[in-house]
């Protein structure tokens, strides 16, 4: 009688052990399956904008799309304020719509600095524009409600100013409209000569605007 109870207990223990092992194996297998998914990370740098220009409040109907420079003057110098516009074609990066931007940085080369430090604002443009854009036409464009990012520029030229624009580029990758950015400064200035910030345009052929994207797919 005692031996029979012992055998039954041993069999029950064996069944329990087997079931427990099988459950653990299933969970482990799921983790292995999840870990086997391939995540590709890469970097793409777009050198040169598809379109870039600046607009001048003091020359409201003039286009500067072929200029070698992108000139910016803060709003405090009105009516001589100037805005910069830049847009990049991301198709060369071939990032799938299922991918996403881990980081994205817009870089502009400040070839000539103002005499006072600027706080440059990069604001997403939400309607289409062309290289023939004028100041008057820029007033009819639509923009995001607030700047995507701001970057401080000093009083020394020959440096690059970087703008983190990850949230916008991630939207572009996922199918959002890509009309680039407006670069402006809402600060008060001294005068239109002292406060002129000059960036190199794509037409300059050197130190052109770039957009660097670290992404996953």
Show where each model-derived region lies.
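Long, small/polar-residue-biased beta-strand-and-loop interaction regions
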Residues: 1-42
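Extended extracellular/luminal ectodomain segments enriched in beta-structured repeat modules
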Residues: 80-83, 93-105
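Flexible, small-residue-rich N-terminal segments that precede or flank a structured functional core
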Residues: 25-92, 130, 142-144, 186-193, ...
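Extracytoplasmic/secreted cell-surface and envelope-processing proteins
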Residues: 97-98, 114-118, 189-199
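Short, surface-exposed loop/turn segments at beta-strand-coil junctions that are enriched for proline
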Residues: 8, 12-15, 92-95, 168-172
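Extracellular beta-strand ligand-recognition surfaces/modules
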Residues: 173-192
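Beta-strand-rich interaction/scaffold domains
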Residues: 45-50, 110-179, 205
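A short beta-strand element within beta-rich, extracytoplasmic domains
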Residues: 88, 99-112, 211
């Amino acid at each position: 009688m005692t031996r029979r109870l012992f055998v039954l207990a041993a069999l029950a223990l064996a069944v329990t052990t087997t079931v427990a092992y099988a459950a653990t194996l299933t969970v482990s297998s799921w983790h292995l399956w999840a870990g086997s998914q391939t995540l590709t990370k890469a970097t793409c740098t777009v050198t040169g904008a598809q379109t870039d220009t600046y607009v001048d409040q003091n020359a409201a109907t003039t286009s500067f799309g072929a200029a070698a420079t992108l000139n910016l003057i803060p709003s405090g110098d009105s009516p001589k304020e100037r805005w910069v516009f830049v847009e990049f074609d991301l198709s060369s990066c071939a990032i799938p719509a299922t991918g996403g931007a881990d980081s994205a940085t817009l870089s502009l080369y400040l070839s000539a600095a103002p005499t006072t430090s600027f706080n440059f604002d990069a604001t997403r443009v939400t309607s289409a524009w062309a290289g023939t854009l004028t100041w008057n036409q820029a007033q009819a464009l639509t923009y995001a409600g607030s700047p995507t990012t701001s970057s401080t520029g000093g009083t020394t030229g020959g440096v690059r100013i970087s703008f983190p624009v990850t949230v916008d580029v991630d939207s572009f990758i996922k199918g959002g409209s890509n009309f680039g950015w407006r670069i402006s400064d809402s600060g008060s200035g001294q005068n239109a000569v002292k406060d002129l910030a000059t960036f190199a345009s794509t037409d300059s052929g050197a130190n052109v605007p770039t957009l660097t994207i670290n992404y996953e797919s």
